[in-house]
């Protein structure tokens, strides 16, 4: 990957293609996820996109994708080589009509 993106006023340099992880722990088991993520890193990627809500629709897998990503990061021991992006504020699966945009919700996510 080329054309990395430098974030002004920081030391962050992002690969121009991020890697979405909604399937981590679902379509990919841990072994597959680790292999896929390593391939992405070996190709020059460093931006991992995740969210607390990923996999919540498969009980009891609350937060499964984030746990798989966390296990992989711990396994490889190079957390600061990566830029982790996440999202918050998504409604809970059983209460989709209730907003989760409070400060507390953002901190929780």
Identify the residue ranges that each predicted region occupies.
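N-terminal binding-site loop/beta-alpha segment at the start of enzyme catalytic domains
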Residues: 1-83
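A short acidic, helix-capping loop that chelates divalent metal ions and anchors anionic groups
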Residues: 54-58, 91-97
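Generic beta-strand or strand-like secondary-structure segments
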Residues: 68-72, 87, 105-109
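A short, structured active-site edge motif that brings together acidic residues
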Residues: 80-92
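Glycine/proline-rich, positively charged
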Residues: 95-109
């Amino acid at each position: 990957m080329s054309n990395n993106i430098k974030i002004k006023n920081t030391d962050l340099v992002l690969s121009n293609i991020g890697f979405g992880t909604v399937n981590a722990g679902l379509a990919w088991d841990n072994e597959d996820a680790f292999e896929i993520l390593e391939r992405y890193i070996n190709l020059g990627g460093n931006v991992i996109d995740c969210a607390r809500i990923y996999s919540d629709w498969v009980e009891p897998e609350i937060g499964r994708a984030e746990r798989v990503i966390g296990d992989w990061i711990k396994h490889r021991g190079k957390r600061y080589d990566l830029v982790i992006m996440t999202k918050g504020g998504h409604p809970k699966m059983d209460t989709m009509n209730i907003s989760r945009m409070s400060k507390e919700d953002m901190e929780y996510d």
